Amino acid sequence: GDVYKRQIMNCMKGACCTLLSLLFSLTVSSGCKEKDMSMKMNEPHNIKGVISYKRSFGDLNDTHLSVAKKIGIRPLASRSEAEGLGGKLVQIKPCERYAMDSLTHSIPFLIPQASALLDTIGANFLDSLSCKGLNPNQIIVTSVLRTADDVKRLRRRNGNASANSAHAFGTTFDVSYRRFCKVEDPDGRPMQDVSPDTLKLVLAEVLRDLRKSDKCYIKYELKQGCFHITAR
């Protein structure tokens, strides 16, 4: 009788183990749905842009200069001077909100107000792309604070480079409208590209709204392929 009881107990234990392992595997498989690795397509909607870039972003150099002189730092002779300005300047670095060119004729410093404006533009642009069904892209900062040394070097390459520029006051930065930085999916899911023309339309909407709410002055730079932006 005892042998028979032991056999039944062993059978029941085995059945329980099988049932438990089956339940475990079902739970795990339902919790770990395979990630969709098909290409993430754009589903664009509600992209309007602005009627005219020149008219929408026509703030002239004098307007930029006037506010830059009021709220900015005094122009610097060299890069080493920027390091010593402590709380007056914020060093900007590529982050989740924006990408940066390797700056050859400027240095990555802005007054806190302009740094905050750049953060807002980058964040609003990403939000706007998401709302309009477009895959994420970052804006690219192409020029920031220029010292007297930077202007001298820039003039050798571009005779029109003005020594009298808002870039000298730490209030002003340029953002490309021709190039953007595609944000790749962290898990490697392929993402459909968004054309630079479409991205330019969305960026123009973001900038128009910030300009209308008196956050900045903006000049559309046709030759340089950028928006020239000064904090207010």
What residues fall within each predicted segment?
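Extracytoplasmic cell-surface/polysaccharide-interacting catalytic and binding patches
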Residues: K33-S130, L222
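Catalytic cores and adjacent binding grooves of peptidoglycan-active enzymes
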Residues: N164-R232
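Stable alpha-helical elements in mature extracytoplasmic
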Residues: L110-L117, I121, N135, D150, ...
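Acidic helix-start/capping segments at beta-turn-to-alpha-helix junctions
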Residues: L134-V151
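Short, small-residue-biased leader/transition segments that mark boundaries at the very start
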Residues: G1-Y4
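Bacterial N-terminal signal peptides
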Residues: T18-T27
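Charged, often glycine-rich, active-site loop that binds/positions anionic groups
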Residues: A148-A163
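Second-shell loop/turn segments in exported
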Residues: M100-P112, I139-V141, D185-D197, T230-A231
